[in-house]
Amino acid sequence: PWRLGADFFFRNLLDGDPASNTLGWRWVGGLHTRGKPYHAQAWNIAKFTNNRFNPGSADLAEVVEGLEGEEPDGLPGVSPPRMPDNPDPRRPTVLLVTEEDCRPEDFDLSRLNLAGCATLTASHLRSPLAVSPLVEEFEREALKDAALRSNLDTTELRAGVPADLARWASRAGATQIATPFIPTGPLRDWMLDAKPALDEAGIRVVEWRRDWDEAIWPLATAGFFK
C-alpha cells in the first residue's frame, strides 16, 4: 500500500522528487527505518487536512507493524556516487535542460562549441497513471524560464521514444550532449534507454555536477533516525 501513496504524491507534488518521495514513503512503512514505522496520529491528520478528515482514536491502529517482511534480506549495500564528467570543448555540443536542474547558467557554457539547446519535459514519466496537469504546467514553465535565461535558440522536446534524443542531436550536428546531473529516477531510466541509439550515432552524454554537490553527496549516508 505504501507504493500507492508514493505514486499519488509523485503524480501531484509540483516539486516531486523521486528520492525523497520514495524514501519518505518507505519510512512510513518502516522499510528504510526498520523497527520505526510511522504511527498515524488523529490530531496530526485533522491539523494537516484542515479538519477535512478528523478520525477518532478507534479509527486508527493502536499497534503499528512495519512491512519489513516484504524485504526480508534487508537493505542493499550503499552504492558509490555516479561520477560526472567534463564536456569536451572541441566537440560540437547540444545543451539539454531538464526539470532535474533548471540552472545551466551555473556552468561555464562559454567554453563549449554549442550547436543547439533543448528542453526535455519528462514529468509524465513519473507514473503509468496520469500526472496532474498542474505538475506538467509547473515543469513546462520552469523549463521555458530556463531556456530564456540561456539566451540560446531552444527546441522543446518530450521524453517519448528514447531514440528521438539521438536523432535530435544528430540533426543539430552534435557529437556531445551536455546536461546538468540527472540523478536516479524516471528520467535517468529514460536516458539509459536512450543510450543504445546515442552510442550508435557516436554521441556521448556528459553530465555536470556542481562542486558543492560533489563535496556533500558522498556524506549523505544516513536516514531519518541516524
Go through each PLM region and give its residues.
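Active-site-proximal binding-pocket segments
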Residues: 1-81, 85-91
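Trp/Phe/Arg-rich N-terminal binding region typifying the photolyase-homology
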Residues: 8-12, 60-226
